[in-house]
Amino acid sequence: MDALMNFGTGIFGGAWPAVWTLIKIVLIVAPMMLGVAYLTYFERKVIGYMQVRIGPNRVGPWGLIQPIADGLKLLMKEIIVPSGANKGIFIIAPMLAIAPALAAWAVVPFTDSLVLANIDASLLYIMAITSMGVYGIILSGWASNSKYAFLGAMRSAAQMVSYEISMGFSLICVLMVSNSLNLVEIVNVQNQGRFAGWGLSFLSWNWLPLFPMFLVYLISGVAETNRAPFDVAEGESEIVAGFHVEYSGMAFAVFFLAEYANMILVSALTSIMFLGGWLSPVSFLPDGILWLFAKMSAILFLFLWFRATFPRYRYDQLMRLGWKVFVPICLIWLVVVGVWMMSPLNIWK
């Protein structure tokens, strides 16, 4: 790494730090966008097997080129702006939806040294930036000049705000036990404790002592990304297709990409906050980025499994779950963790 920095400084001089930052951005965003594309392929394959079908198998070997074909098809489609729509906001809204999903990766650590911006308040940054995705959805529904799109946008806004509260309380618990807002520190703290000393690191991760918070965060993450069974914002049987009903071509594809990018982000954050990030589950295996990818893949599989298994919630059921079940659980467990930390049985010392 030092040789690379010296080489870059020799070529670019004082501009090298800015160039190096741009290179890191490309190295993170490009594979992530490719991962988003192939997550759609993985989803169709997994759900196909669950429904005793084959899934995509025509474009390329085993259908592996299907995501590229879908992207090219959408790229060649016309973006139709409805009459009566606010054209400027209609075009900008998809970009406002995907921008927070990409910007959040600036502080997501892949290892303790591989992170774009290792800032002390990275947890606060994540909570702030991810809450901005709802603006693109609200503006898309309003600018479309369609009752179905506007109704879907209002549903989505209420849903995302409701479940952000539960996710925020879950992360406050993580903050309490980690005593840090830095994501790298949050992972390193999970490698301490009695079980880690015995070589069973996975028992010292936050998922076990904060198990109710882990479940609340995971389920709220599914709701936050508008995925089944919480996809009332785009309920096909009720409001046609929700907030993006009037979109076509690449404008529609960007909303699609934003949804899957948010799925990957929630999987990464769940792995970092509760499952030890890049840490190995046992001491005799080395830590590394592959562990983080394995944990993310397992959580992404749960997203797909939920979609194939559960029917959609009614809107009132969804709101009741968020406000009358998750919020009380979070408040109770915050008190439990606080008392636990002040007691002689504190396991986070």
Swiss-Prot record:
Main localisation, per the record?
Answer: membrane
Q: Which reaction does it catalyse?
A: a quinone + NADH + 5 H(+)(in) = a quinol + NAD(+) + 4 H(+)(out)
Under Gene Ontology molecular function, one entry of this record is: oxidoreductase activity, acting on NAD(P)H, quinone or similar compound as acceptor
Pfam families, alphabetically?
NADHdh
Report the enzyme's class at the first EC level.
translocase
Keywords for this protein: Cell inner membrane, Cell membrane, Membrane, NAD, Quinone, Translocase, Transmembrane, Transmembrane helix, Ubiquinone
The record describes the protein's role as:
NDH-1 shuttles electrons from NADH, via FMN and iron-sulfur (Fe-S) centers, to quinones in the respiratory chain. The immediate electron acceptor for the enzyme in this species is believed to be ubiquinone. Couples the redox reaction to proton translocation (for every two electrons transferred, four hydrogen ions are translocated across the cytoplasmic membrane), and thus conserves the redox energy in a proton gradient. This subunit may bind ubiquinone.
Q: What is this protein called?
A: NADH-quinone oxidoreductase subunit H
What are the top taxonomic ranks of the organism? Bacteria, Pseudomonadati, Pseudomonadota, Betaproteobacteria, Rhodocyclales
